[in-house]
Amino acid sequence: MNFISIECEELFLDYMNPNNPFGQKKDKRIENWISLLSKMPSLENAKSDLLSGVIIKGKCNGSDEKVIENLLSELLPWRKGPFKINNTFIDSEWRSNLKWDRFLELNLDLKEKTILDVGSGNGYYAFRMLGQEAKAILCLEPNLVHFSQFLAINQFIKTNKIRMLPERLETLEIKDTHFDIVFSMGLLYHQRDPSNHLNCLRNRLKEEGQLVIETIVASNEYGDYLEPKGPYASMPNVHFVHTNKGFMDLAEKEGLKVISNSTEVQTTLNEQRQTKWMPFKSYESAVLETHQDITVENFPAPKRKFYVLEKFS
């Protein structure tokens, strides 16, 4: 049985070698990642709770527990999570469960849906989508560290309903496959051409499909968008941070209408922070110590928002 479609199945032809899931990708770390994955102990009678988190429980001896923790720690930094594998708790930089809870408030039904998750990171959200009984999820994530993390976690979960390609949407050779729901979370403000990004996402929707955008929104004082022309909240490659009006106008130009949206939520040190599993600079270095609603570049601190869109009929 094909994964979503014959066309999707063919995308994985270069990644079918069980001894090298990285296909033709070039990176000096790949050999180490392959070795790490081959050494990962298995869990006997493993069971996964993907509804309340990404929680995996199974039988293994004490020494294997430590091996699992040590091997997973070699895949730093863990940006998205958390994950719990028996006694190993991966306390990621982002408490992604908080964003997921905000998504659930939109009451979007994922049951038996085919989903495209663009810029999926290590697959945390895809696992949570599976917990909501999604039919199949295609993840696109060009970052090979995140791709390796997904491969490691899925060695325990062993689902074939989620598959990840280390590719970008814009370069993907896919024309005839369309999805019930397409996700783009935390990507729009990194696009040099946000119109093209929305158009690429729209082109992957079924006629009655829904597009979920999660992004940073700027205050209305900036007109259509804030253009940092440099780092924003210590993030490089932030090109346009749209206002609510600016995003609505952009979506309309691309043949999309907003059917629902969430309230704006300001990022906090509780949601994004430095941890043992992401020991580098984090949000605490992105905002002023005395005024956490102001970035170190003197912009308003990030506020994030969900939009659900459909094609104009």
What is each PLM-predicted segment?
Residues H239-G255:
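Short alpha-helix
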Residues N122-E133:
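Conserved SAM-binding loop of SAM-dependent methyltransferases across substrates and taxa
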Residues L172-V182:
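A short acidic, Gly/Pro-enriched loop at the edge of an enzyme's catalytic core
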Residues I216-V238:
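Short, glycine-/aromatic-enriched active-site segment of Class I SAM-dependent methyltransferases
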Residues M1-S96, E227-P228, E271-E289, P302-V308:
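N-terminal accessory regions of S-adenosyl-L-methionine
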Residues K113-G121:
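Conserved class I S-adenosyl-L-methionine
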Residues D180-P194:
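A short SAM/SAH-binding and catalytic strip from SAM-dependent methyltransferases
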Residues S195-Q210:
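A short glycine-rich, Lys/Arg-flanked "PGG" loop and its adjoining helix->strand segment in the class I
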